[in-house]
Amino acid sequence: MLKVDHASVFFAARYGRTVHALDRVSFDIPERGFVVALGASGCGKSTLLNAIAGFLPLSDGRITLDGRAVEQPGADRGVVFQKDSLLPWKSVIDNVALGLKFAGVKRRERQARALELLRLVGLDEFAGAFPYELSGGMRQRVGIARALATNPDILLMDEPFGALDSLTREQMQELLVSIWDKTAKKVFFITHSIEEALFLGTQVLVMSPRPGRVVARFDLDFVRRFAETGDARSIKASPQFAELREEIRAILHSTEDLRSAA
């Protein structure tokens, strides 16, 4: 289980100012949990993800993964960013296998593992291609495969579909659910899209503008329904989905109004 306990982050800014980015954020991600942090730009979502990844120290609070304190990056956390970080001079399969190479896995074994993951994301036919030959959605699929290569306990995903067109974005959401269902990984996903959060999350954390706080939590089962039925259209068209979308929109607007009035 991932446990985030009263996590706070302060940054030193110019002219001696201090920026309060996160304020006492707490939540858990159990086995097979898919937690989505939802909020406007600048609310601390990426700061929170970077702290979980071990890229950024907390100013206060604690993060643990399966009882171990998170204090630096580790192979137990796979990260996927909005802008892929594929190496352009390496083939798709070598990009996926990169973490395994650093871990000292022999070439034959890491190539076999990478090919297995490319099959999982539907890109095994492109194993020998190079990143420039792929579309944006395909590159993100390679990024997901690479993040899974070291068999992490949790996937951390920082708006990975934000730069994609709407149709590709929906396809990637559905692929991600399939991967989550097959691998049984924990996922922490951040987005500013209400519909994306509702569709993907077993729990949605609605965050306030800076300093980022969790102002509402929603436990959901839309993602499990989709994993069972494959019918995204009826799920998104359901009255329950629409009601929750409007409820969350109202919460986000109210937090923005409070910031404007401050």
Swiss-Prot record:
Q: Which residues bind ATP?
A: 39-46
Q: Which SUPFAM superfamilies match?
A: P-loop containing nucleoside triphosphate hydrolases
Please give the Gene3D superfamilies that the UniProt record associates with this protein.
P-loop containing nucleotide triphosphate hydrolases (3.40.50.300)
Q: Which reactions appear under catalytic activity for this entry?
A: taurine(out) + ATP + H2O = taurine(in) + ADP + phosphate + H(+)
The gene from which this protein is expressed is: tauB
Q: Which organism is it from?
A: Rhizobium johnstonii (strain DSM 114642 / LMG 32736 / 3841)
Q: Where in the cell is it found?
A: Cell inner membrane
- Subunit structure, briefly? The complex is composed of two ATP-binding proteins (TauB), two transmembrane proteins (TauC) and a solute-binding protein (TauA).
Q: What is its main location?
A: membrane
Q: Which UniProt keywords apply?
A: ATP-binding, Cell inner membrane, Cell membrane, Membrane, Nucleotide-binding, Plasmid, Translocase, Transport
Q: Does the keyword Disulfide bond apply?
A: no
What protein does this entry describe? Taurine import ATP-binding protein TauB
Q: What does this protein do?
A: Part of the ABC transporter complex TauABC involved in taurine import. Responsible for energy coupling to the transport system.
Entry EC number(s): 7.6.2.7
Checking SMART domains in the record gives: AAA
The ABC transporter domain covers 4-234
